[in-house]
Structure formats: C-alpha cells, structure tokens
Amino acid sequence: MPMNIPNLITVLRVLLIPIFILLFYLPYHWSYMAASSVFALAAATDWLDGYLARRLEQSTPFGAFLDPVADKLMVAVALVLLVQAHANFWLTLPAAVIIGREIVISALREWMAELGARAQVAVSNLGKWKTAAQMVALIILLANAPAFTFWVVLGYVLLMIAAGLTLWSMVQYLRAAWPHLRPTTEEK
C-alpha cells in the first residue's frame, strides 16, 4: 500500500502518542507543557491530514480507517493520563463519559456498516464541535500540574462541556440509527 502525505501525517499522529506519554511522566517542571505541546501538534495534524486528503484528492480507505482510530487513541490516552494524575470526580466523570461514548459509537458505526447503513451515523458538525472542545480542554489540562488553579478549573469546565456535547452527539447518532435498531416484523 503506497503511503500518501495525508496518511503519513495520520501515522505521525499515532507515533506522537508514546512521545507525549513519556513527556507527561518526566520529572521536570516543563514536562507538562512539553506533553501538551506534542498533544497540540498531534491534534493539529487531525485537521491537516483531512484537509490535505480532500485538497490533494488523496482520500484512501486506509486513511478513512486510521484517522478516527488515531483520534480516539490520542484522546483516550490523554484522558487516562489525566485521570491518573488528577484523581478526582471532576475529571474522572467526563473522562468516563467521553471514552464510553467513543466505544458505543464505534460499535454502532461498525454494526451499521454491516447493515449497509453506515451513512446514518456519519460524523456530524456537533461531533466536530465536541472534538474541538475535547482537544482544547485536554491541551489546557495536559499543560498544567494537577493543582487547583484557574487553568485547571477552566480545563475541567471545558471537559464537562465536551462531555455534555459528547452525550448530545451520542443521542443524535442513536436516534439516527434507531430505525435500524428496532426489531423487524420477522424478528418479533
């Protein structure tokens, strides 16, 4: 399989994950900011790879598969790191909501694809807003030590907003898929 520029950027995003994990755990005063910077770079590549794939007409099945996987890995790893570091309700609850939603929607998309109705659960604008809120919250939280500061509280608030958007988008996806989830007359 030949690798084009958008796919290479997506692979780079996955390869940046262990780097930001390592930076997060380094015992230096600058490590949180460095980890956050690498995470921000990885988040920016999410926009860049999609833009280039469309602009250069280089969309591929591999890129369509790997892009959402890279996003989910990046967000889940960041949330796990932060839950471990902060160990409080204000971070754990939205993290559980966000990770849980990603599992539910990934399974729903897989199942809908098997039914030939994948377009019913395509990415929406609300999903894009949810992703933006998550990324900004995670960049802020990764950049700061787990202390009760203005920036950490702002990160918690943004993550709660992201969790709310996450639930709202999940409800929209489930409503769109509902006609396919109901039993047919022969299944009753």
Task: Tell what function each PLM region has.
Residues 1-7, 11, 16-17, 27, ...:
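C-terminal membrane-associated helical module and adjoining short loops/tails
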Residues 15, 44-51, 69, 73, ...:
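Active-site His/Glu-centered metal-binding helix of metallohydrolases
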Residues 16-62, 78-99, 152-167:
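Membrane-embedded alpha-helical segments that form the functional core of polytopic membrane enzymes
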Residues 53, 79-83, 108, 112-113, ...:
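Hydrophobic alpha-helical interface/terminus motif in multipass membrane transporters
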Residues 65-72, 79:
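Long, highly hydrophobic alpha-helical transmembrane signal-anchor segments
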Residues 66-69, 96-97, 124-127:
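Cytoplasmic-side transmembrane-helix entry/capping segments in multi-pass membrane proteins
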Residues 76, 80, 135-136:
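Hydrophobic alpha-helical transmembrane segments in multi-pass membrane proteins
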Residues 94, 101-111, 132, 136-139:
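Mid-bilayer segments of alpha-helical transmembrane spans in multi-pass integral membrane proteins
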